[in-house]
């Protein structure tokens, strides 16, 4: 059932071609079949808006003829080519969303339970927020850390052996004397770090125990409590005294006694107290000649990165004979060779000898498991929410395999977490449209999982909202169905697929922009919300197809964080950490101040007094950042306030006066500014004579001028009492009168 496309002209129109109006299908057919000019114009209007008006009788006849003529069926090649285009159009977005689904499972960008339309997925309440204190966070973390350390120290590895299975062995005619158990020895192999003097990595083998394991037992008749078990203490996994252990492995060694019959007896020793290391080579050779076989297998517990490899569960290990697969210190590879032919893994377990056991990490012998259970990636049949522990629920004490616990867990979760209103399952149909034609319709689905990311939305409204917001490469239209809902899926031609990530990452290494290692700082922006409308109630009408046929575009609410700025001097991208500091702001660091003073000291065509004024003035301009002509009047007054005392103490008043006159010659300051600066300087000088400080100096005096300022006249030791001015040679008393 194809979707009905409504035209924008308000109906199918009138005339003979009214039945084909209302969409683009009838219009294109009318254009192809019409011969007269009136028919062409009528067909065009029909295809565009759905309205039609015959201008002459010839156009009506042409339109009627078009309706009578048989429509040619498209060739099979065109149909197949069109179908290939349909598959290609939907293939790329589907692959993208499948990839994002896997990445979001590993490192999610956001949590679905925090969304407003997914509030039913959030099972937590905010009751604890009333009593929450920031100071309690540290104590909670310390408590959790202490529990983990004590937990890891008390935990030990418990192995329960189900049996040793060797399917190739045929039962002996002497079944009464046939031995029905084998000797299993478990050793903990410690591969230590290689020291400088060592040629290879030192390997230590620590025996953990021997057990008699049943041979080819019938699991239906054997009780679980009768299986032999072995415990490995957690102290064995601590670093040794002489070497730092790199990895830990379990070595299983199964010894099967021989079958050589002599007076009704079977050769082979079953004593558990025999130490393997004390066995003599001659004795081993004799035992092998008698028919004794040894099978070995090795499994890694902790790898070189201290990652746990053996989790709780049931294991079946393929064993290999000692002669065929000698254990060496070289790097091991997984191989399965029988009669010169490589076998698939499942055939190995069906033909070769295997050892079955159950592994648990426990604090005590009857304690629950402490090691984390490996959870597979979520599928469309798995729930995303964690199961809440209810008072009536009883947990089994025995260890369950991962594959068994997964299926039973899902059933209990579905029964507990599914609300009553969703007990009645909805049938969801997905109909894929391409070029306004129905190309494919899926089978009915009884769940509300997203087909692209397998998210369980639980509600039809939440599913449609999720599809619309998270998979915007498609257009989803909701169509009511008596048994549920039909969702029309089409390609969003107006989708903006431009890069929306951090613009700084584009200028880094190739591929860095599309990687995600964690939260990063973005450019700070500010938006003013003038009006925040009230959130509308959830309604299914927002997912219906719009009447005008326009595609609803997702408006970008925030775009300032994607802007990219550049340094004007280096043309490098401005990082978000540098946004708070203006790169154009000319600060005066210490090295720049020293460089400025050094350059002024190198001048040879100015006297010492002018150099001192130039130093003070340049440092003053650099510090406050004066760059415009209209700032010079204020700069002069501020210079007098900050450096007036230095000018007076260093006898630089006449030099400063010449500097002001020079600035006036270049039209930088006015005469009024000169008068104000001189008046301010005179007041400061009068206060200094009275012993009062005019204003505190902002900078300390770096150099004391004991000699003359300009170098014209020399001051003798006899004339120091007069303190003559360096330029005019007038004494202080006459200088006061002039000022």
Swiss-Prot record:
<feature type="modified residue" description="Phosphoserine">
    <location>
        <position position="546"/>
    </location>
</feature>
<feature type="cross-link" description="Glycyl lysine isopeptide (Lys-Gly) (interchain with G-Cter in SUMO2); alternate">
    <location>
        <position position="75"/>
    </location>
</feature>
<keyword id="KW-0862">Zinc</keyword>
<keyword id="KW-0225">Disease variant</keyword>
<keyword id="KW-0678">Repressor</keyword>
<feature type="compositionally biased region" description="Polar residues">
    <location>
        <begin position="704"/>
        <end position="715"/>
    </location>
</feature>
<dbReference type="Pfam" id="PF09733">
    <property type="entry name" value="VEFS-Box"/>
</dbReference>
<dbReference type="Pfam" id="PF23320">
    <property type="entry name" value="Zn_SUZ12"/>
</dbReference>
<dbReference type="GO" id="GO:0062072">
    <property type="term" value="F:histone H3K9me2/3 reader activity"/>
</dbReference>
<feature type="region of interest" description="Interaction with JARID2 and EPOP">
    <location>
        <begin position="79"/>
        <end position="106"/>
    </location>
</feature>
<feature type="region of interest" description="Disordered">
    <location>
        <begin position="687"/>
        <end position="739"/>
    </location>
</feature>
<feature type="cross-link" description="Glycyl lysine isopeptide (Lys-Gly) (interchain with G-Cter in SUMO2)">
    <location>
        <position position="223"/>
    </location>
</feature>
<dbReference type="GO" id="GO:0005634">
    <property type="term" value="C:nucleus"/>
</dbReference>
<keyword id="KW-1017">Isopeptide bond</keyword>
<keyword id="KW-0804">Transcription</keyword>
<keyword id="KW-0805">Transcription regulation</keyword>
<comment type="similarity">
    <text>Belongs to the VEFS (VRN2-EMF2-FIS2-SU(Z)12) family.</text>
</comment>
<dbReference type="GO" id="GO:0008047">
    <property type="term" value="F:enzyme activator activity"/>
</dbReference>
<dbReference type="GO" id="GO:0032993">
    <property type="term" value="C:protein-DNA complex"/>
</dbReference>
<feature type="site" description="Breakpoint for translocation to form JAZF1-SUZ12 oncogene">
    <location>
        <begin position="93"/>
        <end position="94"/>
    </location>
</feature>
<feature type="region of interest" description="Disordered">
    <location>
        <begin position="378"/>
        <end position="399"/>
    </location>
</feature>
<dbReference type="GO" id="GO:0106222">
    <property type="term" value="F:lncRNA binding"/>
</dbReference>
<keyword id="KW-0597">Phosphoprotein</keyword>
<dbReference type="GO" id="GO:0001222">
    <property type="term" value="F:transcription corepressor binding"/>
</dbReference>
<dbReference type="GO" id="GO:1990841">
    <property type="term" value="F:promoter-specific chromatin binding"/>
</dbReference>
<dbReference type="GO" id="GO:0140718">
    <property type="term" value="P:facultative heterochromatin formation"/>
</dbReference>
<feature type="modified residue" description="Phosphoserine">
    <location>
        <position position="20"/>
    </location>
</feature>
<feature type="modified residue" description="Phosphoserine">
    <location>
        <position position="541"/>
    </location>
</feature>
<dbReference type="GO" id="GO:0001739">
    <property type="term" value="C:sex chromatin"/>
</dbReference>
<keyword id="KW-0991">Intellectual disability</keyword>
<keyword id="KW-0832">Ubl conjugation</keyword>
<dbReference type="GO" id="GO:0016586">
    <property type="term" value="C:RSC-type complex"/>
</dbReference>
<dbReference type="GO" id="GO:0008284">
    <property type="term" value="P:positive regulation of cell population proliferation"/>
</dbReference>
<dbReference type="GO" id="GO:0016604">
    <property type="term" value="C:nuclear body"/>
</dbReference>
<feature type="modified residue" description="Phosphoserine">
    <location>
        <position position="583"/>
    </location>
</feature>
<comment type="function">
    <text>Polycomb group (PcG) protein. Component of the PRC2 complex, which methylates 'Lys-9' (H3K9me) and 'Lys-27' (H3K27me) of histone H3, leading to transcriptional repression of the affected target gene. The PRC2 complex may also serve as a recruiting platform for DNA methyltransferases, thereby linking two epigenetic repression systems. Genes repressed by the PRC2 complex include HOXC8, HOXA9, MYT1 and CDKN2A.</text>
</comment>
<keyword id="KW-0479">Metal-binding</keyword>
<dbReference type="GO" id="GO:0005730">
    <property type="term" value="C:nucleolus"/>
</dbReference>
<protein>
    <recommendedName>
        <fullName>Polycomb protein SUZ12</fullName>
    </recommendedName>
</protein>
<dbReference type="GO" id="GO:0035098">
    <property type="term" value="C:ESC/E(Z) complex"/>
</dbReference>
<keyword id="KW-0156">Chromatin regulator</keyword>
<feature type="region of interest" description="VEFS-box">
    <location>
        <begin position="563"/>
        <end position="639"/>
    </location>
</feature>
């Amino acid at each position: 059932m194809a979707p009905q496309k409504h035209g924008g002209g308000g109906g199918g129109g009138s005339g003979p071609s009214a039945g084909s109006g209302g969409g683009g299908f009838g219009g294109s057919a009318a254009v192809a079949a019409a011969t007269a000019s009136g028919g062409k114009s009528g067909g065009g209007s029909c295809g565009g808006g759905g309205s039609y008006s015959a201008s002459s009788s010839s156009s009506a006849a042409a339109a009627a003829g078009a309706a009578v003529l048989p429509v040619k069926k498209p060739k099979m090649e065109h149909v197949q080519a069109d179908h290939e285009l349909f598959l290609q159009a939907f293939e790329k977005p589907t692959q993208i969303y499948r990839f994002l689904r896997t990445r979001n499972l590993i490192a999610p960008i956001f949590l679905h339970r925090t969304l407003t339309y997914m509030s039913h997925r959030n099972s937590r309440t905010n009751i604890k927020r009333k009593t929450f204190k920031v100071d309690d966070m540290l104590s909670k973390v310390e408590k959790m850390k202490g529990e983990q350390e004590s937990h890891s120290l008390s935990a030990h590895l418990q192995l329960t052996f189900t049996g040793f299975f060797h399917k190739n062995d045929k039962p002996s005619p002497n079944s009464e004397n046939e031995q029905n158990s084998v000797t299993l020895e478990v050793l903990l192999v410690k591969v230590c770090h290689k020291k400088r003097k060592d040629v290879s990595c030192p390997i230590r083998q620590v025996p953990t125990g021997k057990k008699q394991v049943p041979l080819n037992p019938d699991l239906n008749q054997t009780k679980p409590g009768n299986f032999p078990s072995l415990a490995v203490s957690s102290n064995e996994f601590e670093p040794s005294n002489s070497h730092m252990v790199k990895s830990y492995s379990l070595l299983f060694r199964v010894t099967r006694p021989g079958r050589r019959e002599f007076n009704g007896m079977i050769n082979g020793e079953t004593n558990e107290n025999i130490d393997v290391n004390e066995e003599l080579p001659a004795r081993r050779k004799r035992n092998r000649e008698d028919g004794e076989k040894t099978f070995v297998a090795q499994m890694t517990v902790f790898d070189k990165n201290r990652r746990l490899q053996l989790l709780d569960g049931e294991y079946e290990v393929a064993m290999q004979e000692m002669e065929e697969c000698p254990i060496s210190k070289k790097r091991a590879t997984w191989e399965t060779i029988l009669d010169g032919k490589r076998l698939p893994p499942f055939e190995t377990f069906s033909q070769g000898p295997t050892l079955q056991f159950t592994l648990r990490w426990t604090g005590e012998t009857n304690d629950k498991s402490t090691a984390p259970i490996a959870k597979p990636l979520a599928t469309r049949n798995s729930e995303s929410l964690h199961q809440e522990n209810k008072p009536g629920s009883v947990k089994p004490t025995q260890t369950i395999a991962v594959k068994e616990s997964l299926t039973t867990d899902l059933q209990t979760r579905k029964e507990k977490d599914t609300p009553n209103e969703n007990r009645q399952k909805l049938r969801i149909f997905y109909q894929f449209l391409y070029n306004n034609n129905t190309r494919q319709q899926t089978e009915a689905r009884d769940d509300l999982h997203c087909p692209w990311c397998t998210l369980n939305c639980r509600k039809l409204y939440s599913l449609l909202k999720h599809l619309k917001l998270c998979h915007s490469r498609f257009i989803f239209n909701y169509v009511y169905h008596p048994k549920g809902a039909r969702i029309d899926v089409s390609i969003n031609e107006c989708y903006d697929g431009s890069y929306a990530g951090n613009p700084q990452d584009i200028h880094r290494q190739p591929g860095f922009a599309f990687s995600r290692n964690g939260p990063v700082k973005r450019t700070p922006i500010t938006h003013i919300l003038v009006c925040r409308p009230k959130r509308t109630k959830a309604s299914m009408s927002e997912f219906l197809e719009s009447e005008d046929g326009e595609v609803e575009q997702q408006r970008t609410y925030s775009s300032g964080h994607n802007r990219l700025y550049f340094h004007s001097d280096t043309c490098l991208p401005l990082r978000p950490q540098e946004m708070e500091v203006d790169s154009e702001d000319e600060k005066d660091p210490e090295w720049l101040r020293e460089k400025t003073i050094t350059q002024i000291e190198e001048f040879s065509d100015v006297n010492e007094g002018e150099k001192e004024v130039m130093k003070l003035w340049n440092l003053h301009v650099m510090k406050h950042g004066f760059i415009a002509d209209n700032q010079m009047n204020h700069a002069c007054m501020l210079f007098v306030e900050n450096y007036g005392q230095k000018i007076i103490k260093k006898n630089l008043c006449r030099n400063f006066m010449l500097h002001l006159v020079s600035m006036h010659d270049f039209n930088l300051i006015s005469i009024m500014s000169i008068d104000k600066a001189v008046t301010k300087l005179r007041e400061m000088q009068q206060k200094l004579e009275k012993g009062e400080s005019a204003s505190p100096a902002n900078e300390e005096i770096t150099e004391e001028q004991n000699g003359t300022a300009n170098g014209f006249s020399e001051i003798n030791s006899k004339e120091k009492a007069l303190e003559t001015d360096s330029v005019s040679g007038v004494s202080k008393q006459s200088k006061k009168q002039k000022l």
